Amino acid sequence: MQTDNKYRVNPFPSKREQNFSPREIILIRLDFPCEREGFCCFAHQSLTMTTDLSWLSRTQLLIGETALKRLASSHVCVVGLGGVGSYAAEFVARAGVGKMTIIDGDVVDPTNRNRQLPALATNHGESKASIMAERLRAINPELELHVISSFIRPEQVLDSIAETPSYLIDAIDSITPKITFIKTALERKIPLVSSMGAGAKLDPTRLQVVDIAETFNCPFAQQIRKQLKKRFGIRRGLKVVFSPEEPIKESLMLTDGTNFKKSAYGTISYLPAVFGAVCASVAIRDLKDEG
């Protein structure tokens, strides 16, 4: 029976009835013997049964129970589910974050298959957000997931989310919507990490996490810095993932301007995934250390 977002649970007949929230049920350490081995309850919209939560045991072994509880009670929003954002979203889910919002209005294109997690030969034209939602729920069926699979104005992204996220991962790859989203997030003082350009580069060992004012050798970061300063007077205070590797300029290609993009750089399979991993690591490490 649900009362005030608590679930009345009594799997142990000889013990008094217990009141747990869904996340407390996942992570609680019982201080009495379990008379029904493997019993646990979790609810999302309704109360369901689950028998195995051991998939997070290696994470708890590394970061401890307290940090794991912090992640379980956190809400991470990933904006953009391409080569960077799709991997960031997966790594966040696999770390045990309890609530996520994923946002992308795009569909899978054949050219996405060289680097994007949702892209397969069998799903061209399908929504990236819907594909990733199915994947994340398969990783963690108890994940509270909010999916936005339509294009929305960047300044309205945060208004479209019912609950203010604990952390934002910006994996938008177009300059105009990206700077508008960044400005909105900074104004609202929501913790944020932003991915810079993963194109035209090959070496994954060069990635760094710095303030945007400290970026160099990244044409994308240069444009973001320029536009943030010009339009909003923002010069620093934005945590970014970037690579100082010299870009391979010959890999530049002009495009038709679709989705705010006038050009694109060549990409290799692994580098956007590493950018996504570093973005996820920044969010996870910051969240686990809160408090």
Report each predicted region and the residues it spans:
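Hydrophobic/small residue at the entry helix of a nucleotide-binding pocket
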Residues: 84
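Conserved S-adenosyl-L-methionine
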Residues: 94-99
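N-terminal charged helix/coil linker that caps or initiates catalytic domains
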Residues: 47-77, 110
